[in-house]
């Protein structure tokens, strides 16, 4: 399959796939891998919302609104943005009892907000990674709409991930690509980042690093054929996985390795 490389084509491709996934997307948390991710998301959302409880908060790439509704419980006003219209439909239903939440279907390379109006924003999942042709544009937009001393918390995929051992084609791509390489999930490409590359991005956009949380440090040693199964399908393994996940959650606070990193920064 030939993947799109023009940013507009990439956006349309990603939107179409997420539209098609909408009905089953909420079940993704039932998979072993994502169960660990969502635990970290909940902790990070609570920390960001508590640090900036007033003003406008954005959830970029909000999907079906799982993080949006958590923000809404603590933030003054929340706007969720997603490129998929069907995901936005689900998010509206989830948050219909929250009067301080609204949604916009749009592209995060062109945020429809004035300069310096946002107190805090999230971009979890492959929101930045899917925009692999426009990473600098996305960061520039996020910085533009953020208030001075506003918080930005976003997730990026790590280049060197243990699961590459199970995927020789992707391992070869990583070895032969300078900096982050492209990987694929559900027919969509996403960019990975080296630590140096990420650090340089923050410096380029004038952002001050506050915190880094690594996710799935140990769990990526589990073969993908098991890691991406639903927990109900492997109840015996789930007991073992719970122990690994607890250890992962602890290690992720100190180690800068794992499948992805959640980076929290402040605009000076």
Q: Model regions: which residues?
A:
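A short acidic, Gly/Pro-enriched loop at the edge of an enzyme's catalytic core
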Residues: 109-121
């Amino acid at each position: 399959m030939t993947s799109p490389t023009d940013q507009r084509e990439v956006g349309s491709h990603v939107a179409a796939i997420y539209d098609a996934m909408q009905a089953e997307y909420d079940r993704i948390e039932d998979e072993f891998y994502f169960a660990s991710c969502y635990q970290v998301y909940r902790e990070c959302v609570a920390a960001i919302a508590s640090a900036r409880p007033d003003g406008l908060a954005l959830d970029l790439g909000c999907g079906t609104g799982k993080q949006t509704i958590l923000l809404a419980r603590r933030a003054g006003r929340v706007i969720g943005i997603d490129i998929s219209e069907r995901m936005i439909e689900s998010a509206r239903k989830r948050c219909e009892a929250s009067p301080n939440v609204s949604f916009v279907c749009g592209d995060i390379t062109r945020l429809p907000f004035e300069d310096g109006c946002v107190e805090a924003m999230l971009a979890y999942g492959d929101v930045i990674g899917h925009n692999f042709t426009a990473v600098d544009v996305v960061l520039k937009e996020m910085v533009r709409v953020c208030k001075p001393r506003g918080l930005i918390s976003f997730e990026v995929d790590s280049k060197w991930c243990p699961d590459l051992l199970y995927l020789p084609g992707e391992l070869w791509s990583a070895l032969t690509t300078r900096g982050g390489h492209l990987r694929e999930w559900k027919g969509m490409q996403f960019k990975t980042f080296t630590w140096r590359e990420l650090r340089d991005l923050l410096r380029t956009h004038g952002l001050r690093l506050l915190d880094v949380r690594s996710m799935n440090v140990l769990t990526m040693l589990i073969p993908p054929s098991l890691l991406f199964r639903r927990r109900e399908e492997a109840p015996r393994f789930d007991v073992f996985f719970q122990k690994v996940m607890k250890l992962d959650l602890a290690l992720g606070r100190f180690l800068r390795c794992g499948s992805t990193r959640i980076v929290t920064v402040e605009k000076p």
